[in-house]
Amino acid sequence: NDWKVITVGDSHAGALVSAIAEAQQNGDAGVVEWTYSGCAFIQGLKNISAVNVAIHGSDYKCREFIEWAEDRLTALPANIPIVIINRYAAAAFGNNEHKLLVDVPLVYFSKVLTRTTPEFLAEFAQHITQGACELAKHRTVYMVRPIPEMGFDVPKTLSRRMALGVA
């Protein structure tokens, strides 16, 4: 295959993959996108069913996506680097644009929590680090720092303001 880099993560990875392609020295050929909306690529991550069914629908398969991507990575040549991009804040603290879900984790590892706690954040960080280090044993891993949270849907808000002439 002609793959040069794999971008993996949630919708934030999907939003940034074109920038990664643009950064390629010889054009965008070979940039592969493995993304699943609302699904942070973190080893051992489990989604809280009721919350994710409400947000994504009943056929949401985040854990299966993560397992698929991990399996695929083991079968690919080690010279293909991976770029991990996730909206970690939403997974750990809930969607800040949905006021009822603030400080309610959308994911868990060992036990489901109704509030974000320091213990949960430590476990969250441990899984991010362990997963990246495990991948780095076999290939180069790049992790994109968190994208700033705005607390509202920026494209929707700006388009409405533009339509109303308030922008």
For each predicted feature, which ranges?
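Extracellular glycan-modifying ectodomains
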Residues: N1-A167
